[in-house]
Each structure stands twice: as structure tokens, then as C-alpha cells.
A protein has these predicted regions:
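Non-catalytic, usually N-terminal nucleic-acid engagement modules in DNA/RNA processing proteins
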Residues: 1-111
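Catalytic cores of enzyme domains
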Residues: 101-276
Length: 276
């Protein structure tokens, strides 16, 4: 397959999986509330591609970016040629459910927990699609080498990992960082990210930005949406305050964690806002 044909094949396969997989829907058996039964978690994703040797990967080793613990694409897969990143927008039902109150809605909790499980299943599926086309592929989030550290495990950090999906999305041309340190894409900021490293040579997505936060208009709407005042125009997001609030949310539904208030009811919820 030619690179453009392979990318189209991937897009079609990913879209079919997102629309048809039972993992993208909440069953009656697993629902936290009656309103969550039949809930669709995500819409079809945006996809971006970067060359595995893009110089920006090395820049992620800077402590101001990800840090020296960040693994490079060849660390995940020998012969890596491309990195595929995908952003799955939350469904309309998930977004609307989370507009009111200080606590995340049950729908948002599902999108955060079952949603992440689905993102990993999608990563496995993308790897299978590439292998079926004759290439090797690895989903870092599904790999035994994937490591994440949270504030409650190590008080010296709020959160870090050796493969940052947000920074990968930035390198792959999907979007830039917001004041909340999430990613703003052409389909907004309310969604989740995943990625795959492959030996396939795929068309690289142009990065229509040069700065790390070019898509953020600094409107401050997310500041007003945060229930724990963890965001400011001057310093951005206080990761410790945010993470502590997430830990508190675990007490409501054991095994579930989430907030997402800064991702809804804001100009960047559905799209990339236009600079005034």
C-alpha cells in the first residue's frame, strides 16, 4: 500500500472500530446510574502523524516538557518510522452531562475510566490493522514498559510518564496546549488521546502552529469553570491542586476518578477558538 492509501485504510478501520465496538458504549450492567445506560463515550477521532525521527521528540527530554524519563519512538519499537496520534472527542451526551455542578457527572466518570480502557483497546486494534498490512506496530500505553507516576505515589511530582500522549499529539500536528495543559484540537479540547508507534512510513501531518500554546486564546473561561481554583492566567494549572481534587472524587464512586469541568462550557470545548 502507498503511504496515503495506508493512512486512509487506518482512518477507515479506526472509525469503524469506534462506531461499532461495544467498548465505546456503557451497558446496563456497568452503568453508575440509569442516565448512563447506552451511553456512547466517543465520536470518531482526529488522526495525526509524525516521523519517528522528528527533532521535537528529543526536545521532550527537557524537564520543562516531559523530562528525561521520556522514551523515544525507537525505544518502543526497533525500526520505528512513524508515530500515529489520535484524539477522540467526547460524545455530546458526555459533554452536556458535565456542565452543571462541581462533581463530575456519572457519564464523565465513565468516559474517563471505561473510556481509557477503550482507548487502549483501540491502540491494540490500530496495531493489528498495521500488522495486517505488513508492518510492525506497538501501542505504548498498552506496553509493559509504560510507566506513570502520580502525586499520591510520589509527593515530589503531580504526574509524569515516560510517554506523554499530550506531547505526542502536539508533535503529530493535532493541536497545542491550553491554559489547563490539555490539548486544543480542531475538534476542541473535550476528549482523550492515544497513540501507536509503527515501522510503516506514513504521510506526516503538517503542524499549523509554531508555539506550544498557539491555539489557546487565554480567555480565562476555564478559570471560572474549575471547582477548586486550580487555574490562573499567570501560572496556568496547579497540577497538585487538580490531582488532589481528582483523589477526592474517588470517594464518591470507588474505582472512578474524574472532573473535566474545564473542558466543557468553554470556547475550546468543540473547536479551536479564533484569536480575537
Amino acid at each position: 500500500m502507498e503511504p496515503n492509501e495506508l493512512l486512509a485504510y487506518l482512518q477507515d478501520g479506526i472509525n469503524a472500530f469506534v462506531e461499532g465496538s461495544s467498548g465505546n458504549y456503557i451497558s446496563m450492567r456497568g452503568a453508575l446510574s440509569p442516565s448512563s445506560v447506552g451511553l456512547k463515550l466517543f465520536e470518531p477521532p482526529l488522526i495525526g502523524v509524525a516521523a519517528a525521527n522528528d527533532p521535537l521528540f528529543e526536545e521532550m527530554l527537557d524537564e520543562k516538557a516531559v523530562g528525561k524519563q521520556m522514551l523515544m519512538p525507537p525505544d518502543w519499537l526497533e525500526g520505528a518510522q512513524s508515530v500515529v496520534s489520535y484524539f477522540l472527542p467526547m460524545s455530546e451526551r458526555v459533554r452536556q452531562s458535565n456542565l452543571e455542578g462541581d462533581l463530575a457527572s456519572t457519564e464523565w466518570f465513565h468516559a474517563r475510566i471505561e473510556g481509557q480502557m477503550f482507548i487502549m483497546r483501540l491502540g491494540d486494534q490500530v496495531a493489528r490493522l498495521l500488522k495486517a498490512a505488513g508492518y510492525d506496530a506497538v501501542c505504548p500505553a498498552c506496553h509493559p514498559s509504560m510507566k506513570t507516576t502520580f502525586h499520591d505515589e510520589n509527593p515530589s511530582v503531580a504526574y509524569h510518564s515516560n510517554w506523554s500522549e499530550r506531547h505526542i499529539a502536539y508533535i503529530c500536528g493535532l493541536g497545542t496546549f491550553s491554559l489547563t495543559r490539555g490539548i486544543i484540537t480542531e475538534k476542541g479540547a473535550a476528549g482523550r488521546l492515544g497513540s501507536v508507534v509503527t515501522t510503516a512510513v506514513l504521510p506526516v501531518t503538517e503542524r499549523p502552529y509554531s508555539g506550544i500554546d498557539d491555539y489557546c486564546i487565554k480567555c480565562g473561561a476555564c478559570i471560572d469553570r474549575c471547582p477548586v481554583n486550580a487555574i490562573s492566567l499567570e501560572t496556568g494549572k496547579d497540577n497538585y491542586a487538580c490531582h488532589n481534587a481528582l483523589l477526592e472524587s474517588k470517594k464518591v464512586y470507588p474505582g472512578y476518578v474524574g472532573c473535566g469541568k474545564c473542558q466543557v462550557g468553554v470556547p475550546c470545548e468543540y473547536t479551536r477558538p479564533v484569536q480575537p
